[in-house]
From Swiss-Prot:
Organism from which the protein derives: Treponema denticola (strain ATCC 35405 / DSM 14222 / CIP 103919 / JCM 8153 / KCTC 15104)
Biological process per Gene Ontology, one example term: translation
HAMAP family from the UniProt entry: Ribosomal_uL18_B (MF_01337_B)
A GO-annotated cellular component: cytosolic large ribosomal subunit
Record-given protein name: Large ribosomal subunit protein uL18
Length: 120
């Protein structure tokens, strides 16, 4: 499977694995991971000890379906995940950029979550 990946995906996968060695989420401080494609953005908050997703937001949801993949949409997704975390009384997370550069949409998601009071 790894041989089928193109160069860009291989480099992202290598960065992702390097990052994941040091990032681990707990129930008190779960891991917030970002995935972006050309059409969608999704964010999950994961408790790695239990192996469960605590909250998730995606542009595939009905309320966010009209959003495109751009910085403004990333900020809206970040704010939505922040609201859902506040409902579950989670105010601190570990940010996992998932191998993507901390720029553009990924940064906008982080800034949107920070705007709601989430710390990382």
């Amino acid at each position: 499977m790894d041989k089928k990946r193109n160069d860009k995906d291989r480099k992202r996968f290598k960065r992702k694995m390097h990052i994941r060695k040091s990032i681990f989420g707990t129930a008190e401080r779960p891991r917030m991971t970002v995935f972006r494609s050309n059409k969608r953005i999704s964010v999950q908050v994961i408790d790695d000890v239990e192996g469960k997703t605590l909250a998730a937001v995606s542009t595939m949801e009905e309320a966010l379906r009209s959003l495109k993949v751009n910085v403004e949409s990333g900020a809206k997704v970040g704010e939505e995940i922040g609201k859902r975390l506040k409902e579950k009384n989670i105010d601190t997370v570990v940010f996992d950029r998932n191998g993507y550069l901390y720029h553009g949409v990924v940064k906008a998601v982080a800034d949107g979550a920070r705007k709601t009071g989430i710390k990382f």
